[in-house]
């Protein structure tokens, strides 16, 4: 079988929507948003959250991709809730696209899941812990879907050039690099804003994950902690530096969420946060 031809990364990744204009993700484009709850808890929860985010995105005039995870395979504890699973989630992802018009994103942990997930979502995300797994990157790239790669907490930003090359080397130019903090001692992450312009030099859109950047990995013993009060601060800083997209996990009741509650933004606060980020984005990109 012929090997795929290596390509350069696209400066702008277009994510088609079921009913409207595509979401254009590019470092020089208007800010776009990836948002949704950490994990898919139920059909009702997923649809209600997606509808709320769609309404806010329409009011703000911002391109939004709905994200949620069918399986949180890297939870701190083996006893932690992981999500509803691949089989039960596929129809829900498709329903979200059909009834809201939002494109969708989810993360994969297994090479065998990539082609299955690609039938139901628009963007495949590679978790930070798995960002150097060549077989997973190639399997995801081979689906033809856009790929969002979380930079590992253990990687320097310039090391993402080799990670991105695994996707483009498989013939897929639609790839994004996502900053989500770097390990800074035990149970702590820090966001180095120098990473954003460094990763831009790769030539792909750069995403800033504002919620996992405030995570405290394993900080609660059997689960991760977080400091959601710093999400707006870090998000504003990233947008002031200049990014293509901001990733924000949001939940109607984060304090009672099954995972990542301490760093998720309440849905009721989401619209004001994004409205403020759009003002920063307009100033940054007008300069």
Swiss-Prot record:
Matching entries from Gene3D superfamilies are given as: Aldolase class I (3.20.20.70)
Q: Which reaction does it catalyse?
A: D-arabinose 5-phosphate + phosphoenolpyruvate + H2O = 3-deoxy-alpha-D-manno-2-octulosonate-8-phosphate + phosphate
Query: What molecular function does GO assign, one term?
Result: 3-deoxy-8-phosphooctulonate synthase activity
Keyword Kinase among UniProt keywords: no
Transferase: present as a keyword of the record? yes
- The EC number on file is 2.5.1.55
Recorded GO cellular component terms are: cytoplasm
Alphabetic keyword roster: Cytoplasm, Lipopolysaccharide biosynthesis, Transferase
GO BP terms, alphabetized:
keto-3-deoxy-D-manno-octulosonic acid biosynthetic process
- Primary location recorded for the protein, binned into one broad class: cytoplasm
- Give the InterPro entries listed for this entry: Aldolase_TIM (IPR013785), DAHP1/KDSA (IPR006218), KDO8P_synthase (IPR006269)
Question: Which EC class is the enzyme in?
Answer: transferase
Q: In which pathway does it act?
A: Carbohydrate biosynthesis; 3-deoxy-D-manno-octulosonate biosynthesis; 3-deoxy-D-manno-octulosonate from D-ribulose 5-phosphate: step 2/3; Bacterial outer membrane biogenesis; lipopolysaccharide biosynthesis
**Highest rank taxon of the organism:** Bacteria
- One Pfam family per UniProt: DAHP_synth_1
Per UniProt, subcellular location reads as:
Cytoplasm
Q: Report the family membership.
A: Belongs to the KdsA family.
Entry protein name: 2-dehydro-3-deoxyphosphooctonate aldolase
Task: Give the species.
Answer: Caulobacter vibrioides (strain NA1000 / CB15N)
